[in-house]
Amino acid sequence: MREHKNFWDRNAGRYDRFMRKDREVYEKMYELIRPVVKDKTVRELATGTGLISRHIIKAAAHIEATDASVEMIAEAKRDNQSAKLHFSVQDMFRLPYADKSFDVVIVSNALHIVPQPEKALAEIHRVLKDDGVLIAPTFTHAGNSFSGKVRAFFMKLAGFPLHSKWTSEEYLRFLRQNGWAVRKSVVLKASFPLTYAECEKTEV
């Protein structure tokens, strides 16, 4: 995990520039998320520089957005202009919150890059209310086009920490096998296929 954090610390300053190429796809994702978080207490894991939280905060009641990278959170705080949005450094595997604390948990583009993502899902299950919603968009690299495979190859050379290489179907099956009912899914065409998933607990 230390190497994982070091990669994001090194790349925090250029992260937003890297993501600009997928701006239109992210706008579609924000549109999907806003009605789900409307007037809700939200927890975002792996927020990075806070792109998603900043774009949906007007809809939410409050967002606690966290990341394991100190430098990513420093970038996020620099651009934060909302009193409803709070950024902090946290470990998604050991969250300092009581059980059933949040209406919505967002974990975007993170489950494929952490070891043992099922443990992250178990911790999300713990802090999410029984009638809450998990929003888990994830790049599903096994469905890459040829150009996507080339990009992924060079990202790997640069140290990008890819741990799980799913197709969209494999990813949704992984969620179902780990205690979640997928109530909505959409594959968005970004630099890599982005599988947007909204989930509810199957066991409460």
Label for each model-derived stretch:
Residues 43, 47-94:
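Class I SAM-dependent methyltransferase SAM/SAH-binding core
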